[in-house]
Curated annotation (Swiss-Prot):
The keyword S-adenosyl-L-methionine applies. This is Acyl-homoserine-lactone synthase. Pfam families: Autoind_synth (PF00765). PANTHER family: ACYL-HOMOSERINE-LACTONE SYNTHASE, ISOVALERYL-HOMOSERINE LACTONE SYNTHASE. PROSITE patterns: AUTOINDUCER_SYNTH_1, AUTOINDUCER_SYNTH_2. One of its GO terms (molecular function) is N-acyl homoserine lactone synthase activity. One of its GO terms (biological process) is signal transduction. SUPFAM superfamilies: Acyl-CoA N-acyltransferases (Nat) (SSF55729). It catalyses: a fatty acyl-[ACP] + S-adenosyl-L-methionine = an N-acyl-L-homoserine lactone + S-methyl-5'-thioadenosine + holo-[ACP] + H(+). Belongs to the autoinducer synthase family.
């Protein structure tokens, strides 16, 4: 398994198709998220925040199939927290060049979750981020606690599509988080995919 960083402009058409299909498989087919269908690519999942401002972390297996992904966007550009989930923040959603949003985080293999998470933080920090924001459900919040991720809640727990969610903010620097207190591999496939 290896990971790569991409932007949409850098991706080949084949890789874009692979990523769109992987996200559709994970979020629409397996999790049942009610997301708008892509107008021209059936079976692919993209939204209005997939722009030239986004960076993507992709994890590949030995057969060059995508097994994990994450999307990173500076909050100075349109993002999911501001555009869709602004109500989850007690105040205005963060908007600063050093604060990035992480969304569409998912893995097919449980053991990839934390390696992909830490690599996503590193990618953002090297690009100038000091903090990461995003939406998690209560299960993912517990998983972050178990794996030593320090975060703060940006607002109260709310309900979206019959699921409890909340907005959080955390440091983009791994050294600000403690070591995991339990192996991350215990995590079920379902739990891994339950993030925005």
């Amino acid at each position: 398994m290896h990971m790569e960083e991409h932007t949409l402009n850098q991706m080949s058409d084949e890789l874009k198709l692979m990523l769109g299909r992987f996200r559709h498989e994970q979020f629409v087919e397996k999790l049942g998220w009610r997301l708008p269908a892509h107008p021209s690519q059936a079976g692919c999942e993209w939204d209005q925040y997939d722009t030239e401002h986004a960076r993507y972390l992709l994890a590949f297996n030995e057969d060059r199939a995508i097994v994990g992904c994450a999307r990173l966007i500076p909050t100075t550009f349109p993002n999911l927290l501001e555009g869709v989930f602004g109500h989850t923040c007690a105040g205005a959603p963060p908007k600063h060049p050093a604060i990035w949003e992480m969304t569409r985080f998912t893995t097919r293999e449980p053991q990839l979750a934390m390696p992909l998470f830490w690599r996503s933080l590193k990618t953002a920090s090297l690009a100038g981020a000091d903090a990461i924001v995003g939406i998690v459900n209560s299960t993912m919040e517990r998983y972050y606690k178990i794996n030593g991720v320090h975060y703060e809640r940006l607002g109260p727990v709310t309900v979206h599509q019959n699921e409890k969610i909340l907005a959080i903010k955390l440091s983009a620097h791994r050294e600000h988080h403690r070591s995991a207190v339990a192996p991350s591999a215990f995590m079920s496939d379902t739990l891994l995919r339950e993030t925005a």
